[in-house]
Design a protein with these regions (language model features):
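Charge-rich, well-structured scaffold segments of protease-associated domains
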Residues: 1-36, 43-71, 76-184
């Protein structure tokens, strides 16, 4: 009854229009891009060795369900776990003192970032070289199977438990659904 009233008094006075709401994939850059930014430090604080480096790359299509579940596991094995090869290679090379990563899966084009904290600016090329060399080595030799299995088991447990901390389970499931529903 209420919907009929809304239709008769409002909606029926308008013509339906087709809206192209597709979020298109961005074309790859022809060459590597660099961005520089600054952050605040206290007055007189020495800024030597206080840079942050971030190596970022697009990871396929946000609608790829296999990638959606696999990449968090891969990022854990590569960077987040104890002795993770990418993290360890950067630390062994003396690049930064805190290595982390970030994977954003809730966008049309997911991206992966490797971040080094407290780095010297002159280590920029070394940072890139270590990451690319280590990734090529991993492609050639493969991942540590025990680390990979541990990560898979950990994520399986996390998904089965569905523990979202202080957030209601239904709300979090709804937000996860939007990761793919937002795109045509």
């Amino acid at each position: 009854e209420k919907l009929n009233w809304i239709d008769e008094n409002y909606l029926s006075h308008f013509e339906k229009i087709e809206v192209d709401s597709e979020v298109r994939l961005q074309k790859p850059f022809a060459e590597r891009k660099e961005e520089y930014g600054f952050y605040s430090v206290t007055e007189g604080e020495d800024t030597e060795g206080k840079a942050y480096f971030s190596y970022n790359t697009v990871c396929g299509d946000g609608l790829d369900r296999n990638l959606y579940r696999a990449f968090p596991v891969l990022s854990y094995v590569l960077v987040q776990s104890i002795g993770a090869p990418l993290k360890q290679a950067l630390l062994d090379a003396g690049i930064g003192n805190d290595i982390s990563c970030y994977y954003e899966e809730s966008v049309r084009q997911p991206f992966f970032s490797i971040i080094a904290k407290n780095v010297k600016m002159e280590q920029k090329q070394q940072f890139i070289n270590v990451i690319e060399t280590e990734l090529k080595k991993i492609v050639k030799e493969g991942l540590n199977q025990q680390s990979l299995l541990a990560a898979i088991n950990g994520y399986e447990f996390q998904y089965r438990e569905a523990d979202f901390g202080n957030f209601p389970k239904g709300l979090m499931y709804g937000l996860q659904i939007f990761d793919s529903w937002l795109y045509d």
